[in-house]
Amino acid sequence: KLSRFWHKWRFHINVLLLLVPLGFMPKYFADAALFRGDTGLGEREAGEVQVGPWSLRLAELRNEAPRLDGPAGYMKSFNAALCDSCRDQVKATYLRIGKPRSLRAAGVIFFGTPYRMGAMLPIPEKTKADAELWITMEGWDGAMHQASMPLSQASPATIEWLTKQGGKP
């Protein structure tokens, strides 16, 4: 009985097996373009941030709430690109919620090329809605510069998520 069913419907079942993955292709190509940088730094650009004599463009990789990453907690991905004139001068760039106490606590480091760097920032569940995102840049000459931007400007989706979580306003 099963053999008869297979012989009768095998063509239709095989065509269906070929067509089902085609439904996922648009999302695949959109993600591939995002990770390649064809669609910009990320889904949502936060803008240009002046950090001392240098500047960088900051963007959220995905315009969504932070994702739970196991024991590490909730994480949010940011991308950045250094300005043309400062690419050779900047040694490291760090990102953190709240003002860093020192360079040792500067936050998560951006990795990648100066044209497209990425960082996974931990987002504590009790972060205040008026928190600031601090960017620390260290030069090859030892110079260190810091700047901040409101988290609400850098990631409105994170602020919305924090208010749903019960973060303090």
Q: Which residues does each PLM region occupy?
A:
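Structured, soluble extracytoplasmic/luminal domains of envelope-associated proteins
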Residues: 79-127
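Hydrophobic membrane-insertion alpha-helices, especially the h-region
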Residues: 8-29
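Short, conserved beta-strand segments of beta-strand-rich sandwich/propeller modules, principally
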Residues: 130-134
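A short, sequence-level motif marking secondary-structure junctions
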Residues: 62-64, 111-114, 150-155
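Transition segment at domain starts
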Residues: 31-75, 105-111
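Short acidic/polar inter-strand loop motif in beta-rich domains
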Residues: 139-146
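N-terminal Lys/Arg-rich, disordered targeting/topogenic segments
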Residues: 1-6
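Extracytoplasmic/periplasmic copper-protein system
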Residues: 41-48, 151-169
